[in-house]
Every structure is written in C-alpha cells, then in structure tokens.
Amino acid sequence: LEAKMAHENGADEIDMVISNSMVKRGDYDGLLKDVNGVQASCPTCVHKVIIETCLLTKEEIVKVSETLLKSNCDFVKTSTGFCGAGATFENVALIKSIVKDNKLIKAAGGISGAKDAIAMIEAGASRLGTSKGGLIADQLLNGVDAQADDKKGY
C-alpha cells in the first residue's frame, strides 16, 4: 500500500480520499473496510480521511460521517481543496453533529481569511487547511476586522 510505503519513508500522517463511487452505490461496509485497511497498514500514523463534501449530498455526508465514526481514523477532512468548493461552515457543523468529540475535523479549501478560520473552528474544526495562513495570521495579529477576507480563491 502507498500509505505503508509513505510511513516507511518517514510520514507520520496519512491523508486518504474516500471512494465516492462506494458512497454513490451505498457501499458503506466497503468504505469502512477500505478506511480501516489503510489505517491497519500503518497504525502509528495519524489518519485523515478526505470526503470531498462538495461532491456529496447532505444525506451522504451524514452516512459517511456515521461510517467514519465506526472506523479507526483520527480526522474527517472536508476536502482536498482542489475539487470544486472547499469547506463550508454548514458541512463542518453537520460532520461535527455526527462525530461529536469522537473524531477530529479538518476543514480544508476556501478558507480565505481570519473570519472564515474562526467560523470554521466555531463550527467544529480542530485543524484548518489553507493556503492563506500568512494572511490569516496577519489579520489576527492586526485585528480580524483590520482587513477584509480575500475572496479571490484558494
């Protein structure tokens, strides 16, 4: 497995993207087996499972979150940031309502400023994936309202 090779080469965190075809077919048992198989290949790594929320219905996000709650993953990650829309506050809150404090949430993609970052954390994210880290830090150091969020993309 690629995850095992990555771990053998020094990785201590593994990101995996779920099979959306499994979700669309309703094969949540297969999805659970897939996620746990990757985790079993390098059990000492932190495992983040990317669900690409922009490709899923709300009902599918709920079912995937329920499935991941049964898995050995550490994080549910909203997106890669490269597939349509990134994280939304609504989807982070929806995932949090299912996994509660049993899994961590990483909101990724589309977080363009301090206001977005704070809102994602308030919605339940414990980590953020953003290419705007410098801007966010600057806004926080200078006061969140000192600059408008940059909405030119991620």
Where are the regions that the model predicts?
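Conserved anion-binding
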Residues: 1-7, 11-73, 149-154
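Catalytic cores of alpha/beta
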Residues: 1-5, 56-67, 90, 94-97, ...
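Glycine-rich phosphate-binding active-site loops on the catalytic face of alpha/beta enzymes
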Residues: 8-23, 70-86, 107-145, 154
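Surface-exposed amphipathic alpha-helices with a cationic face
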Residues: 35-43, 93-100, 141
